[in-house]
From Swiss-Prot:
Segments traversing the membrane: none
NCBIfam families: PRK05339.1
Protein name: Putative pyruvate, phosphate dikinase regulatory protein
EC number assigned by the record: 2.7.11.32, 2.7.4.27
InterPro entries with a match to the protein in the record: Kinase-pyrophosphorylase (IPR005177), PPDK_reg (IPR026565)
EC supergroup of this enzyme: transferase
Reactions catalysed: N(tele)-phospho-L-histidyl/L-threonyl-[pyruvate, phosphate dikinase] + ADP = N(tele)-phospho-L-histidyl/O-phospho-L-threonyl-[pyruvate, phosphate dikinase] + AMP + H(+); N(tele)-phospho-L-histidyl/O-phospho-L-threonyl-[pyruvate, phosphate dikinase] + phosphate + H(+) = N(tele)-phospho-L-histidyl/L-threonyl-[pyruvate, phosphate dikinase] + diphosphate
Ligand binding (ADP): G153, I154, S155, R156, T157, S158, K159, T160
Annotated source species: Bdellovibrio bacteriovorus (strain ATCC 15356 / DSM 50701 / NCIMB 9529 / HD100)
Keyword terms of this UniProt record: Kinase, Nucleotide-binding, Serine/threonine-protein kinase, Transferase
Length: 281
């Protein structure tokens, strides 16, 4: 489809940051790649007078209006003013709230800035995921002090799966591998020791997991990595490390569901740091 030379203007009116509305608009605009669109975000609009000024400007520029406003009264006023001006408009929040009102059998609470809280939680989760990926398997110890949780364990003790799972819950997680006869990084002992958790696993389970992984990648499962004698040495080394560092709680991940272990880790960390129970999932 051919484009045109016109620049289209979309006004976003929000009682908070407008970030959620902007994200939704951009997602929709992917379907209109040939159009030149200018998005103007008007934040913290919470009165009829403020809304009227935005609508007047939108009218003068022949734009479209999209809005996210919690107040039912203000939404109605915006709808009335936009309709009166003949402005194309769309309420991004109202239809959802109306459906939820019916579903829950009660009216919404008109909480201003509720979407901002959603935005903040979203960006916190993204930040946590990025941090966790960067600090997976000892890739870097820079900013280790920024971690909410640090997992320490030998290979195949679920360090990475646990880290990623927790990061999607908003926790910045670093994981540090225990390598036989290799000293732990100095940075590990310079951070808050209450945030560190040890992971251990039974020998039989570990051997089975390692052999399966080697076979999956077409490698010889009979090497030292999956041998019982080598595994015994690794576990003995890990137990020695954990015995010296008694402040680190140790979790045995053998045959445990990932979610169960993650929840227990968060519960322990929250208790140690004095965090509210609401952080536990």
């Amino acid at each position: 489809m051919d484009g045109d030379n016109k620049t289209y203007t979309i006004y976003i009116l929000s009682d908070s940051t407008g970030e959620t509305a902007a994200t939704m608009i951009r997602a929709a605009l992917v379907q209109y790649t040939t159009k030149d669109v200018n998005i103007i975000r008007c934040k913290n609009v919470r009165t009829d007078t403020q809304a009227e000024a935005v609508i007047e400007e939108c009218f003068e520029r022949r734009g479209m209006l999209a809005y996210t406003v919690a107040s039912q009264g203000l939404r109605a006023k915006i709808r009335e003013m936009a309709s009166g001006k003949g402005i194309p408009y769309f309420d991004l929040l109202g239809p959802l709230l109306s459906t939820l009102d019916t579903f829950f059998g009660q009216h919404s609470e008109d909480t201003v800035g509720a979407l901002r809280a959603v935005d903040e939680r979203y960006f916190k989760r993204i930040e946590a995921i990025e941090y966790t990926v960067k600090h997976d398997d000892g890739k870097t110890f820079a900013e280790l002090d920024k971690a909410d949780i640090v997992l320490v364990g030998i290979s195949r003790t679920s360090k990475t799966p646990l880290s990623i799972f927790l990061s999607h819950k908003g926790w910045k997680v670093a994981n540090v591998p225990l390598v036989l006869d290799t000293p732990l990084p100095e940075e590990l002992f310079k951070i808050d020791q209450r945030r560190i958790v040890g992971l251990i696993i039974d020998m039989d389970s570990l051997q089975r997991i390692r052999k399966s992984r080697l076979e999956k990648f077409g490698q010889d499962p009979g090497g030292s990595y999956a041998s019982m004698s080598h595994i015994a040495k690794e576990i003995e080394y890990a137990e020695k490390i954990f015995k010296v560092n008694r402040r680190w709680p140790v979790f045995n991940v053998t045959e445990r569901a990932l979610e169960e272990t993650a929840s227990e880790i968060v519960r322990i960390i929250a208790a140690r740091l004095g965090l509210p129970d609401s952080v536990i999932f």
